Structures are given as C-alpha cells and as structure tokens.
Swiss-Prot record:
PROSITE patterns: RUVC. It comes from Aeromonas salmonicida (strain A449). One of its GO terms (cellular component) is cytoplasm. The keyword Metal-binding applies. Homodimer which binds Holliday junction (HJ) DNA. The HJ becomes 2-fold symmetrical on binding to RuvC with unstacked arms; it has a different conformation from HJ DNA in complex with RuvA. In the full resolvosome a probable DNA-RuvA(4)-RuvB(12)-RuvC(2) complex forms which resolves the HJ. InterPro entries: RNaseH-like_sf, RNaseH_sf, X-over_junc_endoDNase_Mg_BS, X-over_junc_endoDNase_RuvC. Binds 2 Mg(2+) ion per subunit. This is Crossover junction endodeoxyribonuclease RuvC. One of its GO terms (biological process) is DNA repair.
Amino acid sequence: MSIILGIDPGSRITGYGVIRIVAGKAEYLGSGCIRTDFGELPSRLKQVYDGVSEIITQFKPDEFAIERVFMARNADSALKLGQARGSAIVAAVNALLPVSEYSATQIKQAVVGTGGAAKEQVQHMVTHLLKLSATPQADAADALGVAICHFHTRQSLIKMAGRATSSVRGRYR
C-alpha cells in the first residue's frame, strides 16, 4: 500500500489530490485547493509551501508527483508558476518524499487516453476512475490526474522491469 500526493501548481490556486494504492487499484483519499491571498508573490509562495506541508502532514504520502511547467504566452505568468511549483517541491523534499514530474500531455494521456484532452474530460475521467460521487473542481481534478498518472507510470515501469528480468538473450520465457 502506498499513498501518492499529486499537485497541480499555481501562484493563485494550487490543486492537490491524494490517492492510496491498494492491491493495484487507486482509491480516493482527498483533494482540494490551496488558495493564496492577493498579497505579494513571496507571501503567496509561503502560503503554497505551508499548504503543501500541511497536506503532507495530514495524509502522510509515500510519493509526490507534480505537473511540469508549460511555456505560457505570458513569461511573467510562467515564472510565477515555476516559483509556486518550486515551493511545493521544497515542501516535498523537506518531508523526504521522492519527487516525480509529468507534463500536462503525459497526465492527460494517462487519465483520458489522449494528450490533447480538455479540462472537462480530465474531470470526468478522474470522477469515473476514482468512483467519486461528485465532480471535483478543475484544479483538484488536475492534481488527482497527476497522482493517477504517477500510479500508471509506476505500474508500467514495474511491468517492464519484470519483463526485462524474465528475458534471456532477447527472448521472453
């Protein structure tokens, strides 16, 4: 059994999603958003750090996954997003969690089956995959998608490692 914390970073709203892996299946533990005030950026970054640290204390995850920064049209927005992302990563590293990073395309591919999926499609599939009674808000759904992507990626790597050990001279046994 392991617990995965997924983060969808933002300088105003940072989504989080927590899943537990039991017998090869993902179970929903919690999700939500860390909303920062409209203060100066350093204050908002501290709020992201403190919020992620609090979630780590509450859920005690074993693994941490976060969305990579994409190139935004607005360079200032991309820089702020990167700084918020860094605040979340520092919280994970301080808690001695392994950190994995995924692009938006990888996350959408893992959750919906296509890298070009819309936010609504991600919300729908997260709701379906985790058997939720209500659709989570967009940022929380994206964070749950990050956690699901990490779970699927980890499962694929485990399967590939198993195949590699059963291979002799290029043949599978």
